[in-house]
Amino acid sequence: MERTFLMIKPDAVQRNLIGEVISRIERKGLKLVGGKLMQVPMELAETHYGEHQGKPFYNDLISFITSAPVFAMVVEGEDAVNVSRHIIGSTNPSEASPGSIRGDLGLTVGRNIIHGSDSLDSAEREINLWFNENEITSYASPRDAWLYE
């Protein structure tokens, strides 16, 4: 089973959308196997978004992601990276499809509700960055047979 990293950003946490976002992810067949509400330390934010260092939006991005709590999570399922990217929608909410998380709930590019790993390599790196091994669990669910057999 594939795993990916998702992070509900401060704008969604402040708007009380954690439950709505998780519900959409679970209804699509992905299983939450790790999750935590946390204030992002500056060092973690800088490491996570290191690829954007030097870009014009970098400082604002770091400031935003550390401004209020996020809900970091690991989800598991068949083709989890691609399925989650489809549910999330385009980075710019005004270009995201209706029915996607960003299309329905996002406000601007800078306030777009959720981050999701864009590849298996990114997912592995981000999961290892945000979670310790003991914070992620595996469990059988009766619905697995309905989804994957």
From Swiss-Prot:
Keywords recorded for this protein, A-Z: ATP-binding, Cytoplasm, Kinase, Magnesium, Metal-binding, Nucleotide metabolism, Nucleotide-binding, Phosphoprotein, Transferase
Pfam families for the chain: NDK (PF00334)
Entry's Gene Ontology cellular component terms: cytoplasm
Gene: ndk
UniProt-listed GO biological process terms: CTP biosynthetic process; GTP biosynthetic process; UTP biosynthetic process
Lineage: Bacteria, Bacillati, Bacillota, Bacilli, Bacillales
Record flagged with keyword Chaperone: no
Xref: PANTHER family: NUCLEOSIDE DIPHOSPHATE KINASE (PTHR11349)
SUPFAM superfamilies: Nucleoside diphosphate kinase, NDK (SSF54919)
EC number: 2.7.4.6
The protein, known as: Nucleoside diphosphate kinase
Subunit composition and interactions: Homotetramer.
Active site: H115 (pros-phosphohistidine intermediate)
